[in-house]
Amino acid sequence: NPANMDIDHAGRVWVTEGVNYRRHSGRSREGDCVRVLQDTDGDGKCDSSNVFVREKELECPLGVAVFDNVIFVSNTPNIIKYTDVNRDLKFDPAVDKREVFLSGFEQPQHDHSLHSVYAGPDGRLYFSNGNCGAEFSDKSGNTFRIGGAYLNNTYAGAKSDDGHVYVGGFTASVDPSGHKAKILGFNYRNSYEGVRTSFGDMFLNDNDDPPACRVSHLIEGGSFGFFSRDGKRQWRADKRPGQTIPEAEWRQDDPGSIPAGDVYGGGSPTGIAYVEDSALGKDARGLLLSCEPGRNVVFGYYPKPEGAGFKLERFDFCTTNTTGVFKGSDFVGGANNLSDERQTLFRPSDVCV
């Protein structure tokens, strides 16, 4: 059950495995793992696979990021930082280093929790968290309280140390030492991953509750509308007569809400990537890719400036479901019903270039 992946400077693919998830907890008795895949002879096929680290503490880690010999693993409630000191691709506690980089993220064994770390062109680290919320402190001593009506966190609606009130899911950045954290966007339902381009633009995708999944442009500092601004109410409590579900869920008629972007209905968006070079050919430069396992597809976009944001026109970049029929995500049994093989042929968790 690969949950997230990253590719290092040597072309090795690092993958987190999420076997011990919820009712399957304990299935892998030694814990979940981070695995390294290699093509050692350059023929384009994986011929080597080894476990970098396996720990009982790892339970469905939803993110991995690799920077030279430093590996960040997102495993709620912690971001764990491993340093492979001898660079042998195997974590040895007698030689290598392990530290809890940041902590305080809600909720273990939940997909609306801590997601993957990724880098920005500014040299900072970025990560997202779902609407389970978080109360975490950076290494500068600043505490951020981001709660909501999903888990009814006691700190919902409380000010963070920077003086702002943040609710719902969020995107944050921090410097490589863990200092000077910032909240860049908030009030998502459950943004699995985001990306920051070399021009500084940010994009993300967001799980829905009813059929209103979206891929969006992140305008820094903005609210994406899921909870009320004090975090006390979910969107249904404030739905106005005549509003569609996407308009109400993402509060598109409320002042201060960020434009929802491409709202495409039911699904379960996960990994996202942006192509900036010609690795996939010249036509792929500027291509935004977003995984949608619920619809058996990796969506593609070429973001085009429009007003203060971007126009996002969706197309199928890679799919096994050419008719576009939505057969259901895991929460409605889509992954467990084998009567139609379309549901199990292609359920992409992540995409990297």
Where are these predicted regions, by residue range?
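Beta-propeller domains with acidic blade repeats across secreted/periplasmic ectodomains
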Residues: N1-V353
